[in-house]
A protein has these predicted regions:
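A short acidic-to-branched-hydrophobic micro-motif
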Residues: 41-61
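Short, charged/polar, Gly/Pro-enriched secondary-structure boundary elements
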Residues: 39-42, 104
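Well-ordered alpha/beta subsegment
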Residues: 84-113, 120-126
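Conserved short hydrophobic interaction patches
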Residues: 18, 73-78, 114-125
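Short, internal acidic amphipathic alpha-helical interface segments
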Residues: 55-94
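Short beta-strand-to-loop capping motifs
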Residues: 35, 56-58, 99-103
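Hydrophobic residues embedded in beta-strands of well-ordered beta-sheets
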Residues: 31, 50-52, 94-95
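Charge-rich, low-complexity N-terminal segments
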Residues: 1-40, 80-84, 90
Length: 126
């Protein structure tokens, strides 16, 4: 997996500093942040390096069939933000929502907006 560009790393490091945490890249060049309310935010470079994948994983209070159905219904074009949302479940049962950002347009505002969008979508599950 390719590494982030210098600009993208600077955005992620600034984001982390604003949140009061240190940004440390994993071996696969991804970054992960754990938030008490929002869940686990992961920022991952795409295989082709053209996009940045932003994921938010949250362990649901209940993981029954109706909650899972609501999770998967969120997949597709989000009307509010006009971004394509991906939905899935992690091996630990966490609900995962993700979206792609164009690397060349990646900045603090787009990362903040991605976190807000994903958090609001998670909240809508119930």
């Amino acid at each position: 997996m390719p590494a982030f560009s210098t600009m993208a790393r600077q955005v992620i490091e600034s984001f982390a500093a604003n949140m009061g945490v240190t940004a440390r890249a994993a071996a696969d060049h991804s970054y992960g942040f754990e938030f008490a309310r929002s869940g686990r935010l992961s920022v991952v470079p795409s295989e082709d390096g053209d996009r940045i994948i932003v994921c938010l994983a949250r362990v649901p209070h209940r993981a029954d069939a109706s909650m899972q159905r609501r999770l998967f219904q969120l997949a597709g074009l989000d009307r509010a933000s006009s971004v394509l949302v991906h939905a899935g479940m992690a091996p630990d049962g966490a609900f995962v929502l993700a979206l792609n950002l164009e690397e060349e347009r990646f900045d603090m505002q787009s990362l903040d907006q991605a976190l807000s969008t994903l958090s609001e979508l998670h909240d809508s599950i119930g």
